[in-house]
């Protein structure tokens, strides 16, 4: 037990006692049930792992290992209550079932959600920040598997720069970016890295790109047989430790004109310290939609492929393994499936939402064989993001995000790709891959029956006392914490709830139960956020986590919390019970 002193006005001080965390009432009850004379033996713990933690394959050896790690040398015969509580709240009791790759990785890459970056070279906003290889390295170290580079002639027209065209961003040399990708592509995952090029080059500079890419990537570069188009994408397993180039077939060079940094529409930057709430894709802002139906990403602009190939250097064309491009015509032409050729299509977030109003099932069918990339609308000049569930629920594999930003949308992205060992590839659920007649194709907006109900008990939290100054949340008293608990998923499953606020407590014990009926648990993410209530100002941020529901471990688990930027706190955790009922 320790004491904290807070100043009140100039003359007075308030003193509060800080006490060590204590096991919640239900934990004590469980311990009594699975112990004898105050000791939980190996057999008791083994039964607890099977009955409560739902670890059907747990062995007595697993139980003994837990006792060895959680007990002192003097108490290796079993766990006392404090040691049992320490184990439950410890790092060896995580919320995700598996921390290794466990999905089937032998299907075509069109069958996977892929961790995708947007304008991966930018250090900040979309209009005036620096371009650098550092954000690319950071993204790769976080498990991102798709890196986007906008390539332009340099000022002398004799080399290639990477920058956000028609803005005031300062360029970085392409060769630096390529070397960074080569050096760090497989730091955290062996699965393939896709480099998408937004090409604004002359044919002679395209030849130079081909030389750079071939020299730097060497034998790890994946290229299809000369003169052949892919009829089906290879699998992640077959492409392990390979780099893939994706862009549209080269077209005639058009030199950029004057800088144009003004975008129409409202900047959709984060509205609060921790980020605006994630919008539902059934509550679309029509006025914003009108401003950016065409987006500002010309990666897949309509192109006359026959004309473009006249001057395109063959060595550059040969680099392109994943062809991108929008066929001439409307969205129905874009979504046509060619049985003899697969390709990548890019749509802005607004284009996707507009298309999904009438063509949701066609989009899902398209993504069963082809790749669909979604990118942020042009008015997101502060590098904010959007609701990724819109793309995922329609089967889009590459939902491109500004990784240098932060906010609730990015938390969903980070949470999604904690699945499958954090390798950057997540097998799409079967419902998105089911083919046949239109009645068999998944409709993201359909009202479906409840498949399961997720019950979440938020017992308590701790760790803020160690990771923050004692006046970080409040100058005059300990913090007043509450937790927001909810689901991000298809519209019918999406909801947020909250606990009561507990005043003046560094170790809040809410002990509240929430139930979430889920119609599509395969696309549901559990959201947990802690905030500190402030009567006069905006509530303070106290940590967050987001996790894929389908990979949650049942039972009582320690949920580590993360900062606004997604960095895990050293000590802050929530003790939560997860049940499917």
Swiss-Prot record:
A Pfam family this protein belongs to? PI-PLC-X
Q: Which reaction does it catalyse?
A: a 1,2-diacyl-sn-glycero-3-phospho-(1D-myo-inositol-4,5-bisphosphate) + H2O = 1D-myo-inositol 1,4,5-trisphosphate + a 1,2-diacyl-sn-glycerol + H(+)
Its domain of life reads: Eukaryota
Q: Where is the active site?
A: 118, 164
**Regulation: induction:** Not induced by environmental stresses such as dehydration, salinity and low temperature.
Name where it's found.
Cell membrane
N-terminal signal peptide = none
The Gene Ontology biological process terms listed for this entry are: defense response to bacterium; embryo sac development; floral organ development; intracellular signal transduction; lipid catabolic process; microsporogenesis; positive regulation of auxin biosynthetic process
The UniProt GO MF terms for this protein read:
phosphatidylinositol-4,5-bisphosphate phospholipase C activity; phospholipase C activity
- Cofactor(s) annotated in UniProt: Ca(2+)
- Sequence segments annotated as region (Disordered): 279-314
Q: What is known of its domains?
A: Amino acids 23-36 of the EF-hand-like domain are necessary catalysis but not for binding to lipid vesicles.
Q: What's this chain's function?
A: The production of the second messenger molecules diacylglycerol (DAG) and inositol 1,4,5-trisphosphate (IP3) is mediated by activated phosphatidylinositol-specific phospholipase C enzymes. At physiological calcium concentration, the preferred substrate is phosphatidylinositol 4,5-bisphosphate versus phosphatidylinositol.
Spell out the PANTHER family in the cross-references: PHOSPHOINOSITIDE PHOSPHOLIPASE C 2, PHOSPHOINOSITIDE-SPECIFIC PHOSPHOLIPASE C FAMILY PROTEIN
Query: Any idea what this protein is called?
Result: Phosphoinositide phospholipase C 2
Q: Which organism does this record belong to?
A: Arabidopsis thaliana
Gene that produces this protein: PLC2
């Amino acid at each position: 037990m320790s004491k904290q002193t807070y100043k009140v006005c100039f003359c007075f001080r308030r003193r509060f006692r800080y006490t060590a965390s204590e096991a919640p009432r239900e934990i004590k009850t469980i311990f009594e049930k699975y112990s004898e004379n105050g000791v939980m033996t190996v057999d008791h713990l083994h039964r607890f792992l099977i009955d409560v933690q739902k670890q059907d394959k747990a062995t007595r050896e697993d139980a003994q290992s837990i006792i060895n790690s959680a007990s002192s040398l003097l108490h290796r015969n079993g766990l006392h209550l404090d040691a049992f509580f320490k184990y439950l709240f410890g790092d060896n009791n995580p919320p995700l079932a598996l921390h290794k790759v466990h999905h089937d990785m032998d299907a075509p890459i069109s069958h996977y959600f892929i961790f995708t970056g947007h304008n991966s070279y930018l250090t900040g906003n979309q209009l005036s920040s620096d371009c650098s290889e550092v954000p690319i390295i950071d993204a790769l170290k976080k498990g991102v598997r798709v890196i986007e580079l906008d390539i332009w002639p340099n000022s002398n027209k004799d080399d290639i720069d990477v920058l956000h065209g028609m803005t005031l961003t300062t360029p970085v040399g392409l060769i630096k970016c390529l070397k960074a990708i080569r050096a760090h592509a497989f730091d955290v995952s062996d699965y393939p890295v896709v480099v998408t090029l937004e090409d604004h080059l002359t044919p002679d500079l395209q030849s130079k790109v081909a030389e750079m890419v071939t020299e730097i990537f060497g034998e790890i570069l994946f290229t299809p047989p000369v003169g052949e188009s892919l009829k089906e994408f290879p699998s992640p397993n077959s492409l392990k430790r390979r780099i893939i180039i994706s862009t549209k077939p080269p077209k005639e060079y058009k030199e950029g004109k004057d800088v144009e940094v003004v975008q129409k529409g409202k900047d959709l930057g984060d509205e609060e310290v921790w980020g605006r709430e994630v919008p539902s894709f059934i509550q679309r802002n029509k006025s914003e939609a009108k401003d950016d139906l065409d987006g500002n990403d010309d990666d897949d602009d309509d192109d006359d492929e026959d004309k473009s190939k006249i001057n395109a250097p063959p060595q550059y064309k040969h680099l392109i393994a994943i062809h991108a491009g929008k066929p001439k015509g409307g969205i129905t032409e874009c979504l046509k499936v060619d049985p003899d050729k697969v390709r990548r299509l890019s749509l802005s977030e607004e284009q996707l939402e507009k298309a999904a109003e009438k063509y949701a099932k066609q989009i899902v069918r398209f993504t069963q064989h082809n790749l669909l990339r979604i990118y942020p609308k042009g008015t997101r000049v502060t590098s904010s993001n959007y609701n990724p569930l819109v793309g995922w629920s329609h089967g889009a594999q590459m939902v491109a995000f500004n990784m240098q930003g932060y906010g609730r949308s990015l938390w969903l992205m980070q949470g999604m790709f904690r699945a499958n060992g954090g390798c950057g590839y997540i097998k799409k659920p079967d419902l998105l891959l089911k083919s046949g007649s239109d009645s068999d194709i998944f409709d993201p907006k359909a009202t479906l029956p409840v498949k399961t109900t997720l019950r979440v008990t938020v017992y308590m939290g701790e760790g803020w006392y160690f990771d923050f100054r004692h006046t970080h949340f409040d100058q005059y008293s300990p913090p007043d914490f509450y937790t927001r608990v909810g689901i991000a998923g298809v519209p019918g499953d999406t909801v947020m709830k909250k606990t009561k606020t507990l005043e003046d407590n560094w170790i809040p014990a809410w002990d509240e139960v929430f139930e979430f009926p889920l119609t599509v648990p395969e696309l549901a993410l559990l959201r947990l956020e802690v905030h500190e209530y402030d009567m006069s100002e905006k509530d303070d941020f106290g940590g967050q986590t987001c996790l894929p529901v389908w990979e949650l471990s049942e039972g009582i688990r320690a949920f580590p919390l993360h900062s606004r930027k997604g960095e895990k706190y050293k000590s802050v955790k929530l003790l939560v019970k997860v049940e499917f009922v």
